[in-house]
Curated annotation (Swiss-Prot):
Belongs to the desulfoferrodoxin family. Gene3D superfamilies: Desulphoferrodoxin, N-terminal domain, SOR catalytic domain. Pfam families: Desulfoferrod_N (PF06397), Desulfoferrodox (PF01880). One of its GO terms (biological process) is removal of superoxide radicals. Fe cation 1 binds at residues 10, 13, 29-30. Binds 1 Fe(3+) ion per subunit. The iron ion 1 is coordinated via 4 cysteine residues. Signal peptide: none annotated. The keyword DNA repair does not apply. InterPro entries: Desulfoferrodoxin_Fe-bd_dom, Desulfoferrodoxin_Fe-bd_dom_sf, Desulfoferrodoxin_N, Desulfoferrodoxin_N_sf, Desulfoferrodoxin_rbo, Desulfoferrodoxin_SOR. Keywords: Electron transport, Iron, Metal-binding, Transport. CDD domains: DSRD (cd00974), SORL_Dfx_classI (cd03171). It comes from Archaeoglobus fulgidus (strain ATCC 49558 / DSM 4304 / JCM 9628 / NBRC 100126 / VC-16). This is Desulfoferrodoxin homolog.
Amino acid sequence: MTEVMQVYKCMVCGNIVEVVHAGRGQLVCCGQPMKLMEVKTTDEGKEKHVPVIEREGNKVYVKVGSVAHPMEEQHYIEWIEVIDDGCVHRKQLKPGDEPKAEFTVMSDRVSARAYCNIHGLWQSG
């Protein structure tokens, strides 16, 4: 059974999906069950993976890590998203980009997630 906002990865082809509607079935890709990406908040490498949120009014600035995360061809942040009162705002990134994003939000309480192509899903807030 899936839950809204869970992230799954195909360990065969690398497809990544985020659940937008919960269901009872199992997510399958390439003939194999997809792997649920567990959300990490603290662990080894925290200084380079946990999103750091700064706020000025309704502007939210997110950078990945208190020490900038590498953005190299083999190791980079694929996306950053902010969850704002049920709304999801996402910025896709690629190697060479800076590991940061800016969003306009309406609620007072937000959280941020970032996905590292090697170390998985990280969250703060």
